[in-house]
Amino acid sequence: MSRRRRVVRRAVATEGCSGNVLLARFVNVVMHQGKKALAEKIVFGALKMAESRLQGESGIAIFNTAVANVMPKMEVRSRRVGGVTYQIPVEVREDRSTSLALRWIVKAARASRKRTNKTYMSCLCHELMEAYNKRGGACKIKEEKYRMAEANKAFSHFRF
């Protein structure tokens, strides 16, 4: 039996995000060195750019679809059995799946920022558009996780 206490989840403040908790979490993931106002400016600017590229779709709808397309359902976890470490495929909880999707989108946008000579806002917009269309760096990370889970399906009987 674990002696640790149950973790109490804090509610995310959604002041500037019009009550959208997912968008507030995304702003927090984009935020660097505590500069939340700058992170909000980047995120909302990227959503506005995406909205102008896709006529008829709101920026929030594009964002929600992009995150839903990147959210993983399976991942692998390491488990040591008899001196051998196995990669065991397990299902991902909803909150972890959302967190991973947000992190992967930001990671892909930062990687493309280093490769290209564009602003971070335009790179984030491009990555959101790619995720909306089920392409891009974040979707590649998701597919890679799925391939690992599929390759190690034989070890799924070693459940946690």
From Swiss-Prot:
GO biological process: translation
Coiled-coil region: none
GO MF term set: rRNA binding; structural constituent of ribosome; tRNA binding
InterPro entries named among the record's database cross-references: Ribosomal_uS7, Ribosomal_uS7_bac/org-type, Ribosomal_uS7_CS, Ribosomal_uS7_dom, Ribosomal_uS7_dom_sf
GO CC aspect terms: small ribosomal subunit
Pfam families in the record: Ribosomal_S7
Gene3D superfamilies: Ribosomal protein S7 domain
Cystine bridges: none
CDD domains given in the database record: uS7_Bacteria (cd14869)
Keyword entries, A-Z: Ribonucleoprotein, Ribosomal protein, RNA-binding, rRNA-binding, tRNA-binding
Source organism superkingdom: Bacteria
Function: One of the primary rRNA binding proteins, it binds directly to 16S rRNA where it nucleates assembly of the head domain of the 30S subunit. Is located at the subunit interface close to the decoding center, probably blocks exit of the E-site tRNA.
HAMAP family: Ribosomal_uS7_B
Recorded family membership: Belongs to the universal ribosomal protein uS7 family.
PANTHER family in alphabetical order: RIBOSOMAL PROTEIN S7 (PTHR11205)
Subunit note: Part of the 30S ribosomal subunit. Contacts proteins S9 and S11.
Protein name as catalogued: Small ribosomal subunit protein uS7
UniProt source species: Anaplasma phagocytophilum (strain HZ)
